[in-house]
Each structure stands twice: as C-alpha cells, then as structure tokens.
C-alpha cells in the first residue's frame, strides 16, 4: 500500500491538533509513521480517520488522537528507554521509536507480535524489541524504564510496572473497569512517592494476565 497523499496527511495533522495533540515532536513522529501499514484489508483504507479499528485477536488499533495524546502525556526524551505493555498493531510502538532511544514492547498474543515485528522491519525501526509475554508483569529483565505506557485498562496502576519505573519516570495507563469509561492517568515516580494526574476519559480493552490462546 502507498502512503497517504499530501492532502490526507495535512487533514490528519489538523485533526490531531484540533484534538489537543500540539507538541511538534509528537506530530512529526505521527506524520512519519504510516498508520495504514498496521491495518489489514478494507480497514487500511480508513487508516487516516480518527477512529479505532479492529485488528487480529479481537483487539483494536486506537484512534490516532488518543495515541497522540498518550504519547504527548508520556513526555518522551531522546535518551529514554520506554516499555509499552500491549503491542497490539505496533502503531504506538513505532511512534515511540521515533522519539526514544529504545522501545521494549510486549503482548500476550503471539500473532500480533509477529505481525507488528514484520512492519517494524519494513520500516527499518531497529530500536524496537518486541516480545510475546504477560505484559501485566512488565519486563523485569530490562528494567528500570524511563517511561512506561499501558495500552489496556487496569483497575489500578499495576504494582509490578510501577516497581519497574525509574525515579523521575512517567507511566501513562488507562484506569477503570473494562466495561465502563476509564480514566487516562499519568503517574510520576518521585523520591517521595507517586504523583497522579487524571488526563481524560478513554475506552480500552482490559489488561489481562497470561498468554493469548493463539500464542
């Protein structure tokens, strides 16, 4: 599939700005990553609509404005090491890879990880490490992380992930019941404890333990 034309890209960036994605580095990263590469079949034609779309394993690719707002809230620096819990399509990880030194991404569905890895290779993104695993426990062998982003909803910010966050680090996670509107939370880890900011209402699939049946 060819990438978006100039008009489509301009409309896409305008829509992101109008929904609060205003940081230049985030917009540049999202402009550089073709969302269509992460979608299959008829859904690739809707890649530049600001809507969530279905992918394999009963999962979804989040709407671009939510991806942008979560990325913006994470405040990624060029030297950061980032953990993403929930690879999904790989779209979020690819954007993070444009901003961070190293991205580790984990998903419980082997098929999703394999398909995302193919796109990362196609895009020559050599700073992403993708693994199949139970993301609710993080990646302790690679910890600690400067930034952690969770793309599934937990009832509370997961303790194992907070333990893997560096002092001075930031975690962005949807918090709430899986069958209701959740709240996007930003957690800052300081020497004195944890600071929480409520950002906006969101809807995400639940964060589940264990591996997917397809793995």
UniProtKB/Swiss-Prot annotation:
Gene3D superfamilies given for it? Vaccinia Virus protein VP39
UniProt GO molecular function: protein-L-isoaspartate (D-aspartate) O-methyltransferase activity
Please list the GO biological process terms of this entry. Answer: methylation; protein modification process; protein repair
**Annotated catalytic residues:** 62
Chief location category = cytoplasm
Q: What class of enzyme is it?
A: transferase
Q: Which GO terms describe its cellular component?
A: cytoplasm
Task: Specify the protein name.
Answer: Protein-L-isoaspartate O-methyltransferase
What organism does the UniProt record list as the source? Ruegeria sp. (strain TM1040)
The upper taxonomy is: Bacteria, Pseudomonadati, Pseudomonadota, Alphaproteobacteria, Rhodobacterales
Encoding gene (name) = pcm
